[in-house]
Amino acid sequence: MSHKTKPSTQERKAGKPSAPKRKVISKSPNSKLKTIVKGQKNTAVKAQTSKPLHPRNVHNKGYDFPALIAAFAALKSFVKPNPYGNLSIDFADPQAVKMLNAALLKLHYDVEHWDIPAGFLCPPIPGRADYIHYVADLLAVKKSSKKRVPKGPRVKVLDIGTGANVIYPLLGIQSYGWSFVGSDVDPLSIANAQQVFASNPAIAARFNSRLQTNAKHVFHGVIEPNERFDITLCNPPFHASLAEASEGTARKLKNLAANRAKSSEAKPLRSTKPVVTKTETPLNFGGQKAELWCEGGELQFLQTMISESHEFASQCLWFTTLVSKKENLKPAKALLAKVKAEEVKEMEMHQGNKITRVLAWTFLKPEQRELWAQYRDVEN
């Protein structure tokens, strides 16, 4: 009998002449794609949600705990039936979440060794993988009758705030074979990221780390002269202070306790077939200062990123970032219009009841993007 549990809702949870209007079509069945083109009002192309995660996301079928335990035996002691009779873990236990992540990375991404120091963020992998797949769609080029996502080390990605968990480079390298540069303001995060890749020699050459020595900058001090990136990634700190971050953690823990109490009162489902259910909220509420908050919070971070991106307009094909607070989208888009971004896209990733927003922008015209892709393919 196969015991699979789907990731829960919280886990998967301008002064220039106007350019010609361009039609934008979203082919993603799992997101709402909004595109802004100069000279055109905001339009939304809505698509039906058929699955909670991106079609290429290997976690669409949920957690196969027997397979995970077979791949990573250390997970076994943390797995037990939940009130509904399905195998699960206690997602409030940081060690259990870390063991689950290590098992997922080993089973699905061939990452043999992964670990993070105590107190650092332990990210939910299914949702992080979604970000990788959605930004991959930005790079897709038409080959014959289908669009193809470019693979291999010729695709170069910059991960701003890579963290000790260095999750985006691991997922991007093992999913598409891309090359990554990961930056962070925390020396301990950089050291652990280096250790993770040193422990996985098969992919170590695909990753380089860079310490950002000035926390007030995003791209300055990281992107080198004449260096080019196809994509930049970022999961910004979204709190403006330690007190705000602590309040958010307390609120989540309170909700977790309420959900667990409710689940314990539920009657087990009577069925001889495996039942796929939503588990307790899969969150680990650790995190260091740079991972959780920064001066000015998420909005200030986004404004700095957008302002600096204009200075590297010709060195990056697509800039992208996650936006956790919906109210920050409007001022971010206003600033993008001010710096004359050529095209802006907003992708809403629907993961259960949680909506995660990806904001993407480019300063290159369509013909320049096409030449970029052609040059990249020839260059390598």
UniProtKB/Swiss-Prot annotation:
Keywords: Cytoplasm, Methyltransferase, rRNA processing, S-adenosyl-L-methionine, Transferase. It holds the Pfam family Methyltransf_10. Residues 1-32 are annotated as: Disordered. Its EC number is 2.1.1.181. One of its GO terms (biological process) is rRNA base methylation. GO terms for molecular function: 23S rRNA (adenine(1618)-N(6))-methyltransferase activity. SUPFAM superfamilies: S-adenosyl-L-methionine-dependent methyltransferases. The keyword Cytoplasm applies. One of its GO terms (cellular component) is cytoplasm. It catalyses: adenosine(1618) in 23S rRNA + S-adenosyl-L-methionine = N(6)-methyladenosine(1618) in 23S rRNA + S-adenosyl-L-homocysteine + H(+). The keyword Cytoplasm applies. Specifically methylates the adenine in position 1618 of 23S rRNA. Belongs to the methyltransferase superfamily. METTL16/RlmF family. HAMAP family: 23SrRNA_methyltr_F. This is Ribosomal RNA large subunit methyltransferase F. It comes from Shewanella halifaxensis (strain HAW-EB4).
